[in-house]
Amino acid sequence: MRALWIVAVLLVGVEGSLVEFETLMMKIAGRSGISYYSSYGCYCGAGGQGWPQDASDRCCFEHDCCYAKLTGCDPTTDVYTYRQEDGEIVCGEDDPCGTQICECDKAAAICFRNSMDTYDYKYLQFSPENCQGESQPC
C-alpha cells in the first residue's frame, strides 16, 4: 500500500497522457510502466538511439515511432479519454489528438503484455553507452 501511495504522489506532477498511459499499462499489461519501463533498454524512457535490445525495448521503439507520426499533438500534455467495453479498451473519439495518442498508448500496452516473457532485468537502468550507433528507422 505504501508503494502505491508513493507512485500516486510521484504522478501528481505528471501532466497529460503520461498519467493515462500508466493507467492503460496497468489495465492491459497488468504492470506499471513507470516501474518496469521508465529506464529500460535503449528506447524505454527519455530519448532513444541504437537498436532495441529485446521485444520489450522494441515496444518502446514502436511507441516512440507512433508518437513521432502525430502532427499537432503533444503526447506529454494532451489528455485523452477511453472506456472499457467487453474487456477491450476503446479510445474516446472526442478529440482527434487524444484519440491518436490513446491508440499509440494502447498499442504499446498490448505490445508490453505480449512481450512480458522477454523482459530481462539486465536491461533495467541500461546505460546509454550501450546504445550507440545509428538508430533503426521507424
Curated annotation (Swiss-Prot):
Question: Coiled coil: which residue ranges?
Answer: none
Q: Which GO terms describe its molecular function?
A: calcium ion binding; calcium-dependent phospholipase A2 activity; phospholipid binding; toxin activity
Secretion signal, residue range per the UniProt entry: 1-37
Q: Where is this site: Binds Trp-61 of CA2, important for stability (Asp-89)?
A: 95
A Gene Ontology cellular-component term: extracellular region
Name of one Pfam family that matches: Phospholip_A2_1
Pinpoint the site Binds Trp-30 of CA2, important for stability (Asp-99).
105
Q: Where is this site: Binds Arg-14 of CBb?
A: 49
Tell me the protein's name: Phospholipase A2 homolog crotoxin acid subunit CA
- Source organism (scientific name): Crotalus durissus terrificus (South American rattlesnake)
